[in-house]
Amino acid sequence: MAFPPPPRTGLDWGKTSAETHVHGHVECRWTRETGKWSEPEFVHDPYLRVHGLSPVFHYGQEAYEGLKAFRAPDGEIHVVRPDYHARRLIHSSSLVSIPPVPEELFLSCVNSAVGMNADIVPPHDAQGMLYIRPVVFGMGAWLRLEPPNEYLFCVFVTTAGAFHGSEPLDALILEDFDRAAPRGTGSGKVGGNYSPVIRWSQQAKQDGYDITLHLDSQTRTEIEEFSTSAFVGAHVDGEDITLVVPDTTNVVSSVTCDSVQQLAKSLGWTVEKRSVKYEELSCFSEVMACGTAVTLVSIKSITRKSTSDKFLYQSAAETMGPCAKQLSTLLHDIYKGKIEDEFGWCVKVQDPVSLRKRKAVDDEMRQVKKTTLNGHTRGEQTVQEVN
């Protein structure tokens, strides 16, 4: 059967969710005994058998990633910037004492997880994407606050749409909760950075806000990031456009934000990565939130309740701002293969079955070569002994 297979029939691609049936996920294990990660295994059961005393449950020892895959016009499937995500997972893992998943292994596991579920990658002209969720965590019966003897790395996939949709959002600055402390774990994608904000995000939604924004916890005078995505501001002065991105070690290094900056530079725009003072919110022509799940969405307004400040932007007219629209269109066109990917972001998914067969042949050839070389060596030693 040709790879990749066509999209599965009978799915409403506009209404897919994490409950969409998938064929399975990929697993690798690390043990202290071997000191390395095992060969990837494709597992059909979506449920994990993990000891109840595993550190992931009690100490939050886990890190994760989020990538996406799209189908191009020719039917090929591409994963967006998997190398960047691999390096980011290594960084996140280092913050919570998890052995790094080598980049090559990460890429192989992502390719296998996507390739084995290729039929649920949406059609090229459909809304949505295949969302890829790598996760690594400490496991096994382990109560001590020390590195355990075993870790599990998994790559799951599911169908998904844009997290916030495409309409401009109303943002609320959180003032009663600090996302991350200086010199803390704010730069990592670890669970402890996200679950505490859930109750605040839910309260904000009840109050009529779509997304929450964080100031720095030390001085509360600088913009850091949205709870789900990176912050990008735009100054527009006629034909001159400047994007401003907060430069702080307390936020996650956003893959999409990095892509947006590269796109902006290719368009001749100026990009400034620096500290962004709260007072500067009133000066931006546009504000955007960008991330893997949200892609790029305009911010309609930003509210700070304690000061009664409310900043309105060009997108207040219920349409995406012009800068956001241009960048978003370019991103999606590159992701879906409509225009040339001059940045090399999109990596083609290979048939995992063919790759496994090829690897098996290569391994066998290496073993034969090794055996032959050892045989020659033993033969030479025998000749020397006879002489």
Curated annotation (Swiss-Prot):
Q: Name one Pfam family in it.
A: Aminotran_4
**What cofactor is this protein dependent on?**
pyridoxal 5'-phosphate
Task: List residues binding substrate.
Answer: 64
The pathway where this protein functions is:
Secondary metabolite biosynthesis
**InterPro entries per the UniProt record, alphabetical:** Aminotrans_IV, Aminotransferase-like, B_amino_transII, BCAT-like_C, BCAT-like_N
Q: Name one GO molecular function term.
A: branched-chain-amino-acid transaminase activity
Q: Which GO terms describe its biological process?
A: branched-chain amino acid metabolic process
| Annotated positions binding pyridoxal 5'-phosphate | 88, 225
Q: Does the keyword Membrane apply?
A: no
PTM-bearing positions, type N6-(pyridoxal phosphate)lysine: 189
Family as reported in the entry's similarity comment:
Belongs to the class-IV pyridoxal-phosphate-dependent aminotransferase family.
What is the protein name stated in its UniProt record? Aminotransferase lcsP
